[in-house]
Design a protein with these regions (language model features):
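Short, glycine-/small- and polar/acidic-enriched structural segments
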Residues: 24-164, 170-173, 177-184, 203, ...
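Periplasmic-binding protein-like
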Residues: 103-113, 196-225, 277-279, 317, ...
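Secondary-structure end/capping motifs
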Residues: 225-306
Length: 328
C-alpha cells in the first residue's frame, strides 16, 4: 500500500510539473523578412519576456509571397503584424481583423527623389516618373496625388507610376525620378549604393499628412470573444512592448538578436544597427495603445484614394483598446 501511495504521489508531482511547464502557445506571423523592423518581438523572446508571461511564442518570418491576412485566415497564426490599410481592406472583404495594439506611432514611408531631376516640392512631381509599391502600399500615395490634384495616368500635368519592386534599382538606374522608401531600410540602400543625402530630396508621408498606421498587431475578431484568448493576448502585448522598450534602449544588442534569428544570413550588422536606430524613432513613446486620431486620419486618407480606394466606407469594430487597457 505504501508503494502505491508513493507511486501516486510521484505521478501527481510529475503531472503538476508538466502542467506548470506547459506555457500557452502563440504563433506570430511577421509582415516581412527577419529584420530590425520586428526587433521588439525577437528581443521579447530572447530576453525571456514571453516566458515570464507563461507564453511559448513562435515567430514566423514573412516575405514577398507571404500575406499575413491569408496566413491568419488559414489558421497558420494566432496573431499577425500588418499595416492598417491592408488590414482594413481585408476586413471590408470579409476577413474580420482587429487591431489590438499599435507599437509604431509614426510612419516610416516616404518618396525619395534625385535632386538633379529638379524636384524640390510635390508640385514638381508633374511630368515625372515615380516608383510606387503596390499590394496595398500604393493607397497612401494615390490619396496624396488625389489631394494634390495630380493625375496618375501620365502626361505633362500628371505623374507616370512605375510599379516598383522591393528594391531601389529604378532610382539608381534613372528609370524613375523618385522611388518609395522606408526611413529605416530602402533609403539607406540608396546611400549604400553611392548616392549621398545631398543628392536626394525626401518627402515623408508624415510631413505631407497622408501617412497611415504601420506594423500593428492584429487578431481575428471572433477570438476576442474567448476570455482565455484575450488573457493570452494581454500577456503577449505586455511582453512585446517590454521587448520594444528594451530594443529602443539597447539598439546594438537588439540588432544582434535580430541577426541571430535571421536564418537566411542575408542581413548585415551595419544595416541592422542602423535600421534599429531608425525604427526606435517610430516606436518612441509608444505604449502600444492605438491613437484613435491616427486611426481616423488613416481611414480618411484611404477614403480619398481616388477612383479605386482601398476601402469604400468607414469600418466599424476594426480596433479595440480591450487588450492594451489590461496590459498596462
Amino acid at each position: 500500500m505504501k508503494t502505491l501511495t508513493t507511486l501516486a504521489t510521484a505521478t501527481a508531482f510529475a503531472f503538476a510539473a508538466t502542467a506548470a511547464q506547459a506555457a500557452d502557445k502563440v504563433t506570430l506571423q511577421l509582415k516581412w523578412v527577419t529584420q530590425a523592423q520586428f526587433a521588439g518581438y525577437y528581443v521579447a523572446k530572447d530576453k525571456g519576456f514571453y516566458e515570464e508571461e507563461d507564453l511559448d511564442v513562435e515567430i514566423k518570418a514573412g516575405g514577398p509571397d507571404i500575406s499575413p491576412p491569408q496566413v491568419i485566415a488559414g489558421g497558420g497564426a494566432d496573431v499577425v503584424l500588418d499595416w492598417l490599410p491592408s488590414a482594413l481592406a481585408s476586413r471590408e472583404k470579409g476577413l474580420p481583423l482587429v487591431n489590438i495594439a499599435q507599437p509604431f506611432k509614426s510612419s516610416g514611408m516616404m518618396l525619395t527623389c534625385r535632386k538633379d531631376t529638379g524636384i524640390a516640392s510635390p508640385e514638381d512631381f508633374r511630368g515625372k516618373t515615380l516608383g510606387v509599391w503596390f499590394f496595398g502600399n500604393e493607397y497612401p500615395f494615390l490619396s496624396w496625388m488625389s489631394q494634390l490634384g495630380i493625375p496618375t495616368d501620365g502626361g505633362e500635368d500628371g505623374v507616370t507610376v512605375l510599379k516598383q519592386g522591393f528594391n531601389v534599382d529604378p532610382i539608381l538606374q534613372k528609370q524613375a525620378d523618385c522611388v518609395s522608401t522606408m526611413t529605416y531600410n530602402e533609403y539607406w540602400q540608396i546611400i549604400d549604393a553611392g548616392l549621398t543625402p545631398d543628392d536626394l530630396v525626401v518627402f515623408r508621408y508624415e510631413d505631407q499628412d497622408v501617412s497611415t498606421l504601420e506594423d500593428g498587431i492584429y487578431v481575428l475578431e471572433e477570438n476576442l470573444e474567448d476570455p482565455a484568448f484575450v488573457d493570452k493576448m494581454v500577456r503577449f502585448v505586455r511582453a512585446s512592448m517590454k521587448g520594444w522598450k528594451y530594443a529602443e534602449e539597447n539598439v546594438e544588442e537588439a540588432a544582434e538578436i535580430v541577426l541571430e534569428n535571421d536564418e537566411t544570413g542575408a542581413q548585415t550588422e551595419k544595416h541592422q544597427v542602423r535600421m534599429m536606430g531608425e525604427i526606435a524613432k517610430l516606436t518612441a513613446g509608444s505604449d502600444g495603445v492605438l491613437d484613435p486620431a491616427a486611426y481616423e486620419r488613416t481611414v480618411e486618407t484611404l477614403l480619398k484614394g481616388g477612383s479605386d480606394p482601398v476601402i469604400t466606407k468607414a469600418p466599424e469594430g476594426a480596433w479595440t483598446h480591450m487588450i492594451t487597457d489590461q496590459a498596462q
